From Swiss-Prot:
Monomer. It is found in: Cytoplasm. It comes from Pseudomonas aeruginosa (strain UCBPP-PA14). Belongs to the phosphoenolpyruvate carboxykinase (ATP) family. HAMAP family: PEPCK_ATP (MF_00453). This is Phosphoenolpyruvate carboxykinase (ATP). Keywords: ATP-binding, Cytoplasm, Decarboxylase, Gluconeogenesis, Lyase, Manganese, Metal-binding, Nucleotide-binding. It comes from the Bacteria. Its main location: cytoplasm.
Length: 513
């Protein structure tokens, strides 16, 4: 540890970071040993405050628009200098971590934060290597100064906070942001831009591995079940959110998990429950007077979170990676109650549904989405994090699926028996039954039934799952109402898909009217 007038705490232990956070009034200890913090008025990501510096390497390679907003290079340099000078005048924390577990694909990152707790968060979520940057790669810098306030008129930002990626300089600037998920997603976006150049598909998915070495991927937006379903006591966890798929390997981009905590229970999510202990960070979780977390309390936000390192998960892949996936699962939370609990997809359907990314925003991670639930289409099941045009990722996915022979499934973790407010949400044990059947190989070559309007094939039998749930039309009391809802959903799919320039075979793989 180096001390100066303004102390710089470099690569100190997790215990020391917890100590510093409490000493500075950044958070408090919960009864389970975790550090509990509040993130202020931002309790989720702030997409309107995220920018990418426009320069020669990015100018023609990025899908510019509302998600990827351009930022002038000169404005970035001025703001970086301003934030860095501000931070150098106060105590701060530095850690050296990797982003990407596979030797060939890691990025070395110098992470500087103004708060001890955000440094601990980064240490939970990124990878603490035994040896830092053994290959001597160019270093990335993350500068995360939560107590700096941007001035839009002066700095060119949208508000008092910003997240700006600069690929030319290998820098990520985060200012005025207390919600630590911004740091994790910023580095994910960096890898999502860089990995396709190496013929690696970056994915917003969870991954786990069975005793036999079989790997399953779970794609899905926040709240669809990635973290919950991949945390399976019978399998080894690779990771819960960000992975790369290259020839012969699926590897975690991270070294930890970022689990939603709302209504967390030991019964339904034992792996996550046990992982929340000393060294973990709880964001925006309410404690009772005994300091016991009340996970049902959403008075601060629906998007309460736990960050913990993979070492807190007993059954995990020691190397943070596995082989190529036998099963690829697209998780969708369907609010309409139209989609079946499981559909078996061919390659064209896989491309169609990957590009569509249909789901719901459930207890959304984005600011301004409120507690309301609404349907959305999020390309690649993670549009906010993929800087290149969607076709780049879709082509890589199909290339990988074809080369390895992965089987692809669409799994609905949303509503059945009617839409939101009428039907009910599939319970976790039912969805776990579907996943277990997929992983056992029981659905390979299974007899299927074709559902016309939504153009999906559903297995007639899924071991461990009630047969009457498999065809969603059967679960609706009013069959005509189901048909109308199915047509309505098909229209949404068709309308959304107009923006993609793809082959007729892929277009024909979606819902038809």
């Amino acid at each position: 540890m180096t001390q100066a007038n303004n102390a710089v705490y470099t690569d100190i232990s997790a215990a020391q970071l917890v100590e510093e956070a409490i000493r500075r009034g950044e958070g408090e200890l919960a009864a389970n040993g975790s550090l509990v913090v509040r993130t202020g008025h931002r309790t989720g990501r702030s997409p309107v405050d995220r920018f990418i510096v426009e320069e020669p390497s990015t100018k023609d390679a990025i899908a510019w628009g509302n998600i990827n907003r351009p930022f002038p290079a000169d404005k970035f340099d001025a703001l970086w200098a301003r934030v860095e000078a501000f931070n150098n005048a106060q105590d701060h924390f530095v850690s050296h971590v990797h982003v990407g577990s596979a030797e060939a694909y890691y990025l070395p990152v110098k992470m500087t934060t103004a708060t001890a707790w955000q440094n601990l968060f980064g240490r939970c979520l990124f990878i603490e290597p035994e040896q830092y940057n053994p290959a001597g790669k160019d270093e990335w810098q993350v500068l995360n100064v939560a107590n700096f306030e941007c001035v839009p008129e002066r700095d060119g930002t949208n508000s008092d906070g910003c997240v700006i990626l600069n690929f030319a300089q290998k820098k990520v600037l985060i200012a005025g942001m207390r919600y630590a998920g911004e740091m994790k997603k910023a580095m994910f976006s960096v890898q999502n831009f860089l990995l396709p150049e190496r013929d690696v598909l970056p994915m917003h998915c969870a991954a786990n591995i069975g005793e036999a070495g079989d790997v399953t991927l779970f794609f899905g937006l926040s709240g669809t079940g990635k973290t919950t379903l991949s945390a399976d006591e019978s399998r080894y966890l690779i990771g819960d959110d960000e992975h790369g798929w290259g020839e012969g390997v699926v590897f975690n981009v991270e070294g930890g998990c970022y689990a939603k905590c709302i209504d967390l229970s030991e019964k339904n999510e034992p792996v996550i429950w046990k992982a929340i202990k000393f060294g973990a960070v709880l964001e925006n979780v309410v404690l009772d007077e005994e300091r016991v977390p009340n996970y049902a309390d959403d008075s601060l936000t629906q998007n309460s979170r736990a960050a913990y390192p993979l070492e807190h998960v007993e059954k995990r892949s020691e190397k943070n990676l596995g082989g190529e996936p036998n099963a690829v699962i697209f998780l969708t939370c369907d609010l309409t109650g139209v989609l079946p609990p499981v559909s078996i997809l061919n390659n064209e359907q896989a491309a169609y549904h990957f590009l569509s990314g249909y789901t719901a925003l459930v207890g959304s991670t984005e600011m301004g989405s409120g507690g309301g639930i609404k349907s959305t289409f999020s390309t690649c099941f993670g549009a906010p994090f993929f800087p290149r045009p969607a076709g780049v990722y879709a082509e890589l996915l199909i290339k990988r699926i074809k080369a390895f022979g992965s089987k692809v499934y669409l799994v609905n973790t949303g509503w059945t028996g009617g839409g939101y407010g009428v039907g009910k949400r599939f319970n976790i044990p039912t969805t776990r039954g579907v996943i277990a059947a997929i992983q056992s190989g029981a659905l390979i070559g299974a007899e299927t039934e074709h559902l016309d309007i939504i153009n999906l094939d559903v297995p007639k039998v899924v071991p461990g799952v009630e047969t009457n749930l498999l065809n969603p039309r059967n679960t609706w009391a009013d069959k005509a109402a189901y048909d109308e809802a199915a047509k309505g959903l098909a229209k949404q799919f068709i309308e959304n898909f107009k923006k993609f320039e793809v082959s007729d075979a892929i277009k024909a793989a979606g819902p038809q009217l």
